[in-house]
């Protein structure tokens, strides 16, 4: 199983690594079997699973629910739970409680939190209690209103210096890695070279130690214009649409279900008493 020590070793050995989001049992199982070393149960589930316009409405209960499902599906990947908006902002005590839920209730191995500044103190407290922490700097979606929207961060010298300082502070606080989102490539490379811990980029160019994408973006499940940093490796939205339309047509014209999908009471054919143990998950509604 991948551990935080393995992630550190990736950087030391110059081994680039992939991270993907996972929000449910089947996606986690599939990605785990594909060998993805880190799965992030991101608060982005609010947008791609729950239909919210931002991540802000996502609650800790939402996150724990999905994280539990991911934990049931993945057994080799390092599992990281994303602390949602207002689950760690009120106090250090609140942060401890929220992070503890991810570890105790949901079976996560680590937590992610956004921002620098006072978040550094929270990161230090959590790591001191044995809870591994992944930082997140640059375009931090929980600060979307303060940033005036989803905009690239760190373009000015002042912003860049602040991101670098926050990254060093998070490393000092004990974070095992840092996500750099929506920052110029040269800044991400500079931060990566300045740190002993790995950086994970999303919209941060090729100079980070690892890369992360939202699963639904990578699979082409999200529609409309994708952000510049997204590469769609397939287009499942089109595939699903085509399959659903074909299914509906076959039901309508009576070609589905055919004999091969039906049970028979004829003794020479399939026994009338179906072998329920042969019915895999997903076969029964």
Task: Mark where each language-model region is.
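Alpha/beta enzyme core
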Residues: 2-228, 234, 238-267, 275-285
């Amino acid at each position: 199983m991948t551990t935080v020590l393995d992630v550190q070793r990736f950087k030391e050995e110059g081994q680039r690594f992939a991270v993907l989001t996972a929000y449910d049992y089947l996606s986690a199982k599939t990605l785990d079997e594909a060998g993805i070393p880190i799965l992030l149960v991101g608060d982005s589930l609010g947008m791609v699973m729950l239909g919210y316009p931002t991540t802000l409405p996502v609650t800790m209960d939402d996150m724990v629910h999905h994280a539990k499902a991911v934990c049931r599906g993945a057994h080799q990947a390092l599992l990281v739970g994303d602390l949602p908006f207002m689950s760690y902002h009120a106090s250090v005590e609140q942060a401890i409680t929220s992070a503890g839920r991810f570890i105790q209730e949901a079976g996560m191995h680590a937590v992610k939190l956004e921002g620098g500044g006072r978040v550094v103190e929270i990161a230090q407290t959590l790591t001191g209690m044995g809870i591994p922490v992944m930082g997140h700097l640059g375009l931090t979606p929980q600060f979307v209103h303060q940033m005036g929207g989803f905009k690239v961060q760190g373009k000015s010298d002042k912003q860049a210096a602040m991101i670098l300082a926050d990254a060093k502070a998070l490393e000092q606080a004990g974070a095992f890695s840092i996500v750099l989102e929506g920052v110029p490539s040269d800044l991400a490379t500079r931060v990566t070279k300045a740190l002993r811990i790995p950086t994970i980029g999303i919209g941060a160019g090729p100079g980070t130690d690892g890369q992360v994408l939202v699963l639904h973006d990578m699979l082409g499940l999200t529609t409309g214009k994708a952000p510049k940093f997204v590469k769609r490796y397939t287009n499942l939205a089109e595939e699903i649409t085509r399959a659903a339309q074909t299914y509906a047509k076959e039901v309508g014209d009576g070609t589905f279900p055919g004999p091969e999908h039906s049970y028979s009471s004829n003794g020479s054919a399939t026994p009338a008493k179906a072998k329920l143990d042969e019915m895999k998950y997903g076969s029964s509604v």
